[in-house]
Each structure stands twice: as structure tokens, then as C-alpha cells.
Amino acid sequence: MESRIIEIDPNCVNEFEKLKKKYKIESIFLKLNDNFNLLYVEKTLSKISQDDFLESIPVDQPRLIIYKKYSNNKIIFIRWIPEIVQDTIEYSYSNASTAILELLIGINEYMEVKDLIQLSNL
């Protein structure tokens, strides 16, 4: 499979810096555009319950999620790839993960998740 160049919207890093500086942001949802060549911020969430966080994750679509766990001040990078996602889409999100992680200084933990149950103990 041909490797694609993934462009990173600068807002991805800007929102990450806000999350690190303890602004009201608790999680950042990153998504690839329809051409799978641009990673952008889909949404940010302020402090919400664990249940609300889990409900905000699309069950059938991949996302890259940056989550700040305030109880221990850790920043977790989550690569959410549901089981039903096609291999080509999973590959694109893998490339996007690699590209964005090179720009984000301060990630404490990395998780590859295929089932929401894995996130129930964040």
C-alpha cells in the first residue's frame, strides 16, 4: 500500500498546548478528512463525566483522541479504531498517529483501542 503524506492542521497542536496548560479542555478529538490527507480538530470537550466522554466517541468511526486525566495529570493519546473499520482506513489513521505524535511533546501514555470497554477505566 502506498504511503500517504498526512497534513496536520496547526489547530491540532494549538489545542494540545491549551490542554497541557490546564485550560478547560479535557479531550481533543482528531479526525482525518474524506481524502485521508488532512488531520484536523473535530471537537474539544471540557470536563465531563466518564460516561459522557465514552458516549462522545463514535462507535463505528476511527478517531485520534488526546485525553487529559486530571486525577494523575497524565495526557493519554488514544488511537480509536473500531473492529469494523477497513484496513485502508486503519492504515491512514496509523500514519496520522505517527505524524501528529512527532509534533506533540508531553504525551504520557499511548493506547490502541478497538473496543470501548478498554476505555472504561481511564
Curated annotation (Swiss-Prot):
Record InterPro entries: ADF-H, ADF-H/Gelsolin-like_dom_sf
Keyword tags: Actin-binding, Cytoplasm, Cytoskeleton
GO biological process: actin filament depolymerization; actin filament severing
A cellular component annotation (GO) from this entry: cytoplasm
UniProt subcellular location: Cytoplasm, Cytoskeleton
Top-level division of the source organism's lineage: Eukaryota
Main location: cytoplasm
One Pfam short name: Cofilin_ADF
Domain ADF-H residue range list: 3-122
Record's keyword annotation contains Amino-acid biosynthesis: no
Gene Ontology MF terms in the entry: actin filament binding
Family the UniProt entry places it in: Belongs to the actin-binding proteins ADF family.
Function, as annotated: Controls actin polymerization and depolymerization.
Protein name per its UniProtKB record: Cofilin-5
